[in-house]
Amino acid sequence: MTLHRKYGSDERIIIHCETVTKVAKILADAMLKEGKEVDVKAVLAGAMLHDIGRSRVHSVRHGLEGANIVEGEGVEMKVVEIVRKHVGAGISREEARALQLPDLDYIPATLEEMIVCFSDKMVDADRVRPFEAEVHRFTVKGHDVSRLVALKRRLQQELGEDPEKVIFDKVKETQ
């Protein structure tokens, strides 16, 4: 929260990041219960900071800007990578070049990166929503829906069940 305040993040962005953090914690805890090794602290920090780059820019570059901010603040590289790779369902090296981003691979690869990226896709503003709503948004915007579906599938393989169901079951428990 200190970094969000320092860099002037809008209150809506902070609330969104808090909601994504709650969703990411649900998934990280479920992974731990399945015996998966997951750095929960990195997941929570990455989820809370994933949109800090929006304090500078509201484009596809916000992931890169956010990564630069948190790296400059001395945040652990694992968290820097989570912030950098959360945009869309990831951005390939070729897409990055076309978007005039640094020539890097922005596709979530670690369990922590995938958890935060997926959690972000499950949250619209401060509301958890069905995965199909994000599929629809990706389709309308012309984004790579297959990469989004693959992200969910990868998490499902790790978790042994549908991550969307895990999230909604837990959300229902807390209501």
Identify the meaning behind each predicted range.
Residues K6-K36, L49, V75, E95-Q175:
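Divalent metal-dependent phosphate-bond-processing catalytic cores, especially two-metal-ion Mg2+/Mn2+ enzymes
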Residues V20, V38-E73, V80-G90:
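His-Asp-centered metal-binding catalytic motifs of divalent-metal-dependent phosphohydrolases/nucleases
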